[in-house]
Amino acid sequence: MARRPARCYRYCKNKPYPKSRYNRAVPDSKIRIFDLGRKRAGVDEFPLCIHLVSNEYEQITSEALEAARICANKYLVKIGGKDSFHLRVRAHPFHVVRINKMLSCAGADRLQTGMRHAFGKPNGLVARVNIGQVLMSVRTKDSSRATAIEALRRCQYKFPGQQRIIVSKKWGFSQYARDEYIEKRSRGEIIPDGCYAKFLNKRGSLQEKLDLFPEASFNLA
């Protein structure tokens, strides 16, 4: 039987129905990789962050997320190189959609019950997204701004509904605005923590601060 079109599952009509002990035999999600590019790049290397944001309350299939991931990654690698960006898919498919298979051959009425017992069996996974929810994010250098915007624009053709591209005011994937990040980084109030930044407050034990700054223990000695 052919795959049912995604337009049949576009709207959020029912409650969330995740995989569980009473919802078994769920097929695997088509998207298995959510981070691509230079994932281990420090927070200082990629200051620019661009988001693809949903404008609708809808469901997006795992096949569409995988198609968008491949589309964006291929364009970014082709134009900027594989080490020039960090792409992250922010929507995760957890909602299970069902299908009540119907036979269309001769004598089908003898083999099936029609709309009686029509609950259906698990058929795939979709992500339930809200208005304003981020679907994909790219952090890169300021020189690659046009490339990242074009990559996310191409991803819009893989999704139903409407989306918009937003250039974030934050520094990369961190929670700090760009001006705030530069100021606090120069004063030593935040330190890099992978692709994020950690704020150093003035509270806490002395041992905790020494663990963050091992070189300070030599000054105490």
From Swiss-Prot:
Keywords: Cytoplasm, Ribonucleoprotein, Ribosomal protein. Its main location: cytoplasm. InterPro entries: Ribosomal_uL16, Ribosomal_uL16_CS_euk_arc, Ribosomal_uL16_dom, Ribosomal_uL16_euk_arch, Ribosomal_uL16_sf. GO terms for cellular component: cytosol; cytosolic large ribosomal subunit. The keyword Electron transport does not apply. GO terms for biological process: cytoplasmic translation; ribosome biogenesis; translation. Component of the large ribosomal subunit (LSU). Mature yeast ribosomes consist of a small (40S) and a large (60S) subunit. The 40S small subunit contains 1 molecule of ribosomal RNA (18S rRNA) and at least 33 different proteins. The large 60S subunit contains 3 rRNA molecules (25S, 5.8S and 5S rRNA) and at least 46 different proteins. There are 2 genes for uL16 in S.pombe. This is Large ribosomal subunit protein uL16B.
